[in-house]
Swiss-Prot record:
One Gene Ontology MF term: asparagine-tRNA ligase activity
Name of the protein in its database record: Asparagine--tRNA ligase
Matches recorded under InterPro entries: Aa-tRNA-synt_II (IPR004364), aa-tRNA-synth_II (IPR006195), aa-tRNA-synth_II/BPL/LPL (IPR045864), Asn-tRNA-ligase (IPR004522), Asp/Asn-tRNA-synth_IIb (IPR002312), NA-bd_OB-fold (IPR012340), NA-bd_OB_tRNA (IPR004365)
PANTHER family found in the cross-reference section: ASPARAGINE--TRNA LIGASE, MITOCHONDRIAL-RELATED, ASPARTYL/LYSYL-TRNA SYNTHETASE
Recorded catalytic activity of this chain's protein: tRNA(Asn) + L-asparagine + ATP = L-asparaginyl-tRNA(Asn) + AMP + diphosphate + H(+)
Organism in which the protein naturally occurs: Pelobacter propionicus (strain DSM 2379 / NBRC 103807 / OttBd1)
Keyword RNA-binding: no
Length: 459
């Protein structure tokens, strides 16, 4: 039975024999002693395996190359080398899988662009090993947070007939013959399709999540979402993961309070439970990352009305690339100026103009704004977007009519307001944006295992 390297280094007893397995990061020989850097993915540094010339294991050294997979049995001993407390003195080595000089991940620095081309191998690198361990632990932390706060986990559908955001950026799901689909009045007849109507991959689980919040009070979804948005930017991908909580009997203030508690928790979790990875990111990816994340974990989260945000941006004297006017959405440059220069920390922007927000957001008494909020943080700007949902059936129907949104496809959503409706609120947090923020990585393609972007669906 093999021992995980991370557990061996933290719990192993010096002088005892252990069996480990992993992949060779590097091999060097000095004065008749071989030093193998072996990593099984459980930690950043792996472990140093020492093979002395008189050991039977030394006979395998000539066949070992970077990238090989090995099984090693040996004695755990104190290490005289700097930077490591213990190492494994090998007694036997078995080569499980061979490698050669053509292995793409030789011991040198590779660009992120190159590593994207070998996404099937990049998890073996230090940087991406750290990224995906952090991603895994954060996913576990998200479930722990909501479980500890009595939220129900809901699996919302991947295939849907609704477009929550109303942007028409759905990937279509169809079994019709693309070359000769059945036609109705000259157009494809989706009534003959698998589901009997147009369907696509979900852009959000929010609408379905609301239905469960109106039965279980507090729920959350955490799953993949899809946007057929032809954007080749470091912040956009066609497939990504979203965390979307919904709370019944809650207003915008409750929504912001939950978002603040959630972000604080995740920042503290990363600092405390992923300390090795976070220290690596601070050294290799973004100097000062630890302090930046620590400040967010400890800061006061300012609440600022959209009206005030516009006024303060206009008074700043800064010439922005995008105009600053009431009624226009804030761009990333505006968001970052607010959080980095005006506030100097996290900030909620509250109550946006209704004309730039979605139909489901609750109209405020002024009929000019809706109960919407964005959480802005230094370095990235918006990281969370949310709102109080419109619970009044007549107001919701009027808003849909105003925007030309058909009622029939959303009959079930409207019916939820007919019986036992109540104030409710929720928000969305893009999981990849969270991983980028906590790791310092600057491209979404580098925080998801196999990125899906325009004209790229390999692996």
């Amino acid at each position: 039975m093999r021992t995980i390297i991370r557990q061996l280094l933290s719990q192993g007893v010096s002088g005892q024999t252990y069996a480990i397995a992993g992949w060779v990061r590097s091999l060097r020989i000095s004065k008749g002693i071989a030093f193998i850097a072996l990593n099984d993915g459980s930690n950043l540094a792996g472990i140093q395996v020492v093979v002395e010339e008189q050991s039977p294991a030394f006979s395998e050294i000539d066949a070992i190359a970077t990238g090989c997979s090995l099984r090693v049995t040996g004695t755990l001993v104190a290490s005289p080398a700097a930077g490591q407390e213990r190492e494994l003195r090998a007694e036997s080595i078995a080569i499980v899988g061979t490698s050669d000089e053509n292995y793409p991940l030789q011991k040198k620095r590779h660009s992120f662009e190159y590593l994207r081309e070998i996404a099937h191998l990049r998890p073996r690198s230090n940087t991406f090993g750290a990224v995906f361990r952090l991603r895994s632990r954060l996913a576990q932390a998200i479930h722990r947070f909501f479980g500890d706060n009595n939220f129900l986990y809901v699996h919302t559908p991947i295939i849907t007939a609704s477009d929550c955001e109303g942007a028409g950026e759905l990937f279509r799901v169809t079994t019709l013959d693309a070359a000769s689909p059945p036609l109705l009045e000259g157009r494809p007849d989706f009534g003959q399709d698998f589901f009997g109507q147009k369907t696509g991959l979900t852009v959000s689980g929010q609408l379905e999540g609301e239905l469960f919040a109106l039965a279980f009070s507090d729920i959350y979804t955490f799953g993949p979402t899809f946007r057929a948005e032809n954007s080749n930017t470091p912040r956009h991908a066609a497939e990504f993961w979203m965390i979307e909580p919904e709370m019944a009997f809650a207003d915008l203030a409750d929504d912001a309070a939950l978002a603040e508690k959630f972000v604080r928790y995740l920042c503290r979790f990363a600092l405390e439970e992923c300390a090795e990875e976070m220290a690596f990111f601070d050294r290799q990816i973004e100097k000062g990352l630890l302090e930046r994340v620590r400040r967010v974990a400890e800061a006061d989260f300012v609440r600022m009305e959209y009206d005030e945000a516009i006024q303060r941006l206009q008074r700043s004297g800064v010439t922005f690339s995008y105009p600053v006017e009431w009624g226009l959405d804030l761009q990333t440059e505006h968001e970052r100026y607010i959080t980095e220069k005006i506030v100097g920390g996290p900030a909620f922007i509250l109550n946006y103009p209704r004309d730039i927000k979605a139909f489901y957001m609750r109209s405020n008494p002024d009929n000019r704004t809706v109960a919407a909020m964005d959480l802005l943080v230094p370095k990235v700007g918006e990281i969370i977007g949310g709102s109080q949902r419109e619970e009044r059936l007549d107001v919701l129907e009027a808003r849909m009519a105003e925007l030309g949104i058909a009622r029939e496809p959303l009959w079930w959503y409207l019916e939820s307001r007919r019986w036992g409706s109540c104030p409710h609120a929720g928000f969305g947090l893009g999981f990849e944006r969270l991983v980028m923020y906590l790791s310092g990585m600057e491209n979404i393609r580098d925080v998801i295992p196999f990125p899906r972007t325009p004209r790229h669906a390999e692996f």
